[in-house]
Curated annotation (Swiss-Prot):
Gene3D superfamilies: BH2638-like. It comes from Lysinibacillus sphaericus (strain C3-41). Belongs to the UPF0223 family. This is UPF0223 protein Bsph_1378. It holds the Pfam family UPF0223. It comes from the Bacteria.
């Protein structure tokens, strides 16, 4: 699947790379799972670049529209899980 990652023109090249790596972690959590510690490190770096909650929500929405992957459940599970846990989003079955 080809799509563009959301980013700001105000970010440096390094920041853009780090945000793309964060979203690659979101993709991995949806597809095959990612270690909690790895995802948390990616999220912490993302929050250094995007400290505003409102901007985070906007970027998450843009990423979801482009990719179909929802970021919030991954972040929530990452924050709540213990170290050593694999973060994996299981799709909900239609009723």
């Amino acid at each position: 699947m080809e799509y563009s990652y959301p980013f700001s023109t105000d970010w440096s090249t390094e920041e853009i790379v780090d945000v793309v790596q964060f979203f690659e972690g979101i993709e991995q959590a949806h597809e095959k799972g990612i270690k909690r510690e790895v995802m948390m490190a990616k999220y912490r770096r993302f929050k250094e670049i995007v400290p505003s909650q409102a901007e985070e929500k906007t970027i998450f929405r843009e990423f979801e529209e482009a990719s179909g992957y929802i970021s919030y459940p991954v972040v929530k599970q990452t924050k709540e899980a213990a170290d050593g846990t694999i973060i994996k989003i299981v799709p909900k079955k239609n009723r």
